[in-house]
Each structure stands twice: as C-alpha cells, then as structure tokens.
UniProtKB/Swiss-Prot annotation:
Binding site for Mg(2+) 1: 408, 415
Protein name according to UniProt: Lysine--tRNA ligase
Pfam families, sorted: tRNA-synt_2, tRNA_anti-codon
GO molecular function, one term: magnesium ion binding
Subunit structure: Homodimer.
Keywords noted in UniProt: Aminoacyl-tRNA synthetase, ATP-binding, Cytoplasm, Ligase, Magnesium, Metal-binding, Nucleotide-binding, Protein biosynthesis
Cofactor(s) the record lists: Mg(2+)
Family per record: Belongs to the class-II aminoacyl-tRNA synthetase family.
Entries under SUPFAM superfamilies matching the protein: Class II aaRS and biotin synthetases (SSF55681), Nucleic acid-binding proteins (SSF50249)
Originating species: Prochlorococcus marinus (strain MIT 9301)
Catalytic activity: tRNA(Lys) + L-lysine + ATP = L-lysyl-tRNA(Lys) + AMP + diphosphate
Assigned EC number: 6.1.1.6
Amino acid sequence: MSEIKEARLQKASSLVSKGFASYAQSFRVSHTTSFLIQKFDYLENGQEENFSVSLAGRVMAKRVMGKIAFFTISDQDGQIQLYLEKRIINLNLEKQKLLSFEDIKEIVDIGDWIGVYGTIKKTNKGELSIKVEKWEMLSKSLQPLPDKWHGLTDIEKRYRQRYLDLIVNPHSKNVFKTRAKCISFIRKWLDNRNFLEIETPILQSEAGGAEARPFITHHNTLDIPLYLRIATELHLKRMVVGGFEKVYELGRIFRNEGISTRHNPEFTSVEIYEAYSDYVDMMNLTEELIKDILADACGSLTINYQNKEIDFSKPWLRISMKDIVKKYTGIDFHSFNGDFLAAKKAVKNINVDFSNKVNTIGRLLNEVFEQKVESKLIEPTFVIDYPVEISPLARPHFDNKEIVQRFELFIVGRELANAFSELIDPVDQRERMQLQQSLRDKGDLEAHCIDEDFLNALEIGMPPTGGLGIGIDRLIMLITNSASIRDVIPFPLLKPEISSKKSEKLPLNEVK
C-alpha cells in the first residue's frame, strides 16, 4: 500500500473516531455551480449576498493561509471557490456536532467529495465564492488525482480510466455532454416528424442487414447459437411491412472487426425508414438533419475539424461513384462495357491492391474508390449509384440493373451515412441473398445469410421505402473536433492489460 493511501485511510479513520462518516449516505444540494455563477455575476468585488446555498463537489484545489482557507470544488457543471474562515466555521461547534476548521485543514485532500453550507460573496480579487458556514465529508478519496499541471498525458490511460480523464480534462467532459445533447436532439427531431422509435433485438438468430462479421454467443436453455446484431435494418423493415410507415432506432451495433481511429467493435448508429420515400428523399432528410444538429450543437454551419474549415451551408455535392472515380483517378468505368480484364489492367496502373474476392467490375470500382478517392472527400459529398454486388439490400436503377439507388455521405474523408431505396421485390431479394449465401459458404464471413423470415415478410408486401443509417460516433467526432472515435465513446474497447493471474476462458456453451 502506498504511503499516500495509508495516510488517507488514517484520515478516514480519524473522521469515524470523531463520530462522523467518511462516506456519507446523502447530501441535499440546493444549487449547481453554473446557476450560482450566472445568477450572481452582478456582484461587485468584495460584495456579499445573504443567499443560502448547499453545494457539493470534488475538491480540486486547496490553499490554507493561517485562519483562512480557499478550496475549489467541481460539480457536473463547473467549478467554484469556497472561502472558509476559522472564526465562522468554529462558531457553532459547542451548539452542534460539526467538523471544525482544523478538521478541514488536516483531513480534506484534493480528490475528496465534500458538501458545504453557506452564503455568496465575491472576493476582493473578483472571484465568486461560497462563504462556508459548515461542511461535511461526503466521500474520502484514497488515491491522489493526476498532477493538475501535467494532467493525464497517457492517452491509453485516459481511455482505460475514463473517470480520471473526466476529472482532470474539462474538454472530455464537454465532449460527452455534447454527445448526450446531440443524441437527445436527434430523437426529438425525428419524433417531431412523426417517426416512431422501435426497439429491435440485440440477440438475433441471423446476423443480417450489413456486410460484417458478427459476434457469436450461445443460449444455454434453447441450445442455439445467437449473434449480436450488426444492423437494425431487417427488423425495422419488418415493422414497415407491418404497417408502421416512419420508424427509427438509435442504439448499439456490434461488429467483430478491426479497431482504428474510425472503428470500434461496439458503436452507435441511428437507422431511419420512411415508407413511400426513396434515396433522394433520404439525401434531403440527411442534409436537413445534420445541418440542424450542427446549428444546435455548434451555433454555426461552418466548423473547424482538425485544421480544416468546412462550410455546411453550401449545397452538398451529389455525384455518382463512377464519375467521382474518374474525377480523381482518370479511369472511366463507363467505358469498360463489362470487360473485367481491361478494368483490372487500368486499376493496376494506378497501384490499387485488391484480393481475389474482387472479381467483378463493380467490386473493382468500389476498391478504387475506397483506396484512391474516399480520403479526398473533405466537404460534404453524397456519392450515389453504387454497384449492385456490394449492395444486396438496395433497389436497382430502372435503366441499369448493375447499379443501385444508394448513396453514402462522406465528410472529412470518411463515411458518415449510408442509405438507399430499399429493395422490396421478394424475388430479386431472394436471388441476391442466395448469391450472398454462396459467397459465405466459400468463406466470406461478411456475406449475408439467407433470412427466410425476412423474405417471407417481403412476400407479404412492403411499400416503397427509403432507408438511412448515420454513424453517431463519427458525427460526434466531427462536432467536437475529436481525432479518434475513442475520444467520443466513454468506454471504448481495449485489449485487457496483462495480469499476473490469467483469467479462465469458458467454452461458449458454458458462458452464462
């Protein structure tokens, strides 16, 4: 045990020996720091206000100068100074069982949670303060906080011990406040437009709705494998079949894939479906929604992200994948007319690497786009008309069955949204799922399985529908100017630190 921890344990014991709790049951707070700072901004230096308050927070700074002490405490909204005089604190010790000025000098450490009662004053130096009359220990901290001058510089420690990051880094706290407000805003925005939020299963017997590798678990009682959902799409479409014309779900998605500054295996998305709409309607909805979120969260449609200024007020570019690939690479995929070898030769000339799985012109086009174009799309750009091979759930164009009515929105070089006119033809959908299943049987773990119940739902009849998915984490990265997705997820997935005791790994059918 460290000397600091031992000393703090002794202080906690000292409180108990004096008849006080070192870990209180409760404390009634009358106001927050932000309320008090705003309400009493008018006070002149040295002026006092006989306004009684009770306030609680974590001690972030402590200065004792003889018979006077200054503390800074932090609550969820901000920080405020405490002003303590020995004469005032000790005034009622004989009448009431209270902690003394000497107690607060000796027992309270930076990191402790305390509650105080007092009135308002502004010091001669202009610092709004609580003039403390009595105080209580709410929770004794046994470990010191990171040094306030150097902060928490170990980035991985910030992610592993987010509680420390939130204590010493106000920016991190603001990021998660902004995240919560944006999520609330999205729900209200959709609710006000008569969309209904639906809760779909997280545990599913078939993992569908996206090309992604799922997490697999096992249900002991039913003795069946289950999958954590990789999308909410197929169940939300079932709701549309059932007669709900405007539905959405904002929730967690799980994909057993890589980790990077843009990817976390557990992430948040909102999927939106509207009957009688198509992908053009979804483009309009996407642009309107994101502009409204930015205006609410940032107060402007011009933001700075990682030293790049982005103006969202300008019209957002809408361009086909073939045309934007031609713009940035010079390769005209319109000209190949089904000649895969010619396309393959042209692509190799610009140093695009691809696997044997890339065996059609459509997949080759997508590979060129991802490797040579995507990172260059800084301003909001709707890339439309995707190859049918990579879009098994999207409606084909009437005049060209090789491309589908799909778009993805790219901002600062990364995908932020994905949408399409939904495929509602059950015969076409079955053929595509059968093709996906054959790819899966050959080892492509990201290909779709055949979902017979979903196909049955389509055979019952689904109206024309537009569908949209927006990545919430990437949106929050943009709004908060965060470089990594780990900065906007409170508890991102990390590899466990090496422990001296190895954990026992249970077989799947024994996990409960």
